[in-house]
Amino acid sequence: MTRPPNISEDVRLRLDIAYDGTDFAGWAVQAGQRTVAGLDEAFTTVFRTPVRLRAAGRTDTGVHATGQVAHVDIPGTALSKANPRSPHTGDPEFLPLLRRLSRLLPVDVRVLDIACAPVGFDARFSALRRHYRYRLSTAPYGVQPNQARYVTAWPRELDLDSMSAASRDLLGLRDFAVFCRHRHGATTIRELQRLEWSREGYLITAHITADAFCWSMVRSLIGALLAVGDHRRTIGWCGELLTKASRSSDFTTAPAHGLTFIRVDYPPDDELAERAVITRDLRSSF
């Protein structure tokens, strides 16, 4: 259930965000680097108080998003000043705020929607699953110019039947350490729920879904499967990699620009808080 803003307390907002990751060094704040989390600065300007966004997924350098979700806690008094009620009946509640942000933000990042978050909502820990898409072109000319920032050119034909068979060996709750860059204190156990391939002419698309992803996991999975697709490796090789306890150098990580974060799934509103507790416990138990 979503509560109306109360100026006497902080209000949690849900933000739906899209960005072209080409010129960003990922989501997370990094000293001296331009990152998507720099959205904090725009919100701080609008609300005249320091704020910090929490995202559903921290995308890597060069990775795009059409369906990133974040939350931010804003003092009710600051929110009421930054978002005066629209005089037009039927307009979205936060339309004035959305328009102010659109004027402040660079053209390669947009806040698509703003809403009061339901009670118990946490953009990261309430999430059930994240969906990514990876796109490649096997066209002899490479990639169409208007898609060059979002599609990876692949110089060889790919055997999608072999890639699909190898992908099935990776599904389920597993330790994906071999496909993840090390991050101190972070678990590499994830549930990979979908990894499917489709083809439309020269365009090949991977559809990837998991409860969560660790650092560089998606691009590493794609890189390993491409080695199967052009017959440098056997179908069973990817499954065999899972027996390794640390990241492998046996495959090349796929280029970042072909990857897009497209959607986050959440449970019904009355299950959000419980889901956040379960996720926190799960992440700390491994």
From Swiss-Prot:
Record's catalysed reaction(s): uridine(38/39/40) in tRNA = pseudouridine(38/39/40) in tRNA
Catalytic residues (positions): D60 (nucleophile)
Keyword line: Isomerase, tRNA processing
EC code(s) of this entry: 5.4.99.12
GO BP: any one term: tRNA pseudouridine synthesis
HAMAP family cross-referenced by the UniProt entry: TruA
Domain of life, per lineage: Bacteria
Coiled coil: none
Residues reported to bind substrate: Y132
InterPro entries listed in its UniProt record: PsdUridine_synth_cat_dom_sf (IPR020103), PsdUridine_synth_TruA (IPR001406), PsdUridine_synth_TruA_a/b_dom (IPR020097), PsdUridine_synth_TruA_C (IPR020095), TruA/RsuA/RluB/E/F_N (IPR020094)
Pfam families for this protein: PseudoU_synth_1 (PF01416)
Family the entry assigns: Belongs to the tRNA pseudouridine synthase TruA family.
Family annotation (Gene3D superfamilies): Pseudouridine synthase I, catalytic domain, C-terminal subdomain, Pseudouridine synthase I, catalytic domain, N-terminal subdomain
GO MF entries: RNA binding; tRNA pseudouridine(38-40) synthase activity
Protein's recorded name: tRNA pseudouridine synthase A
Cited function: Formation of pseudouridine at positions 38, 39 and 40 in the anticodon stem and loop of transfer RNAs.
UniProt enzyme class: isomerase
Subunit structure: Homodimer.
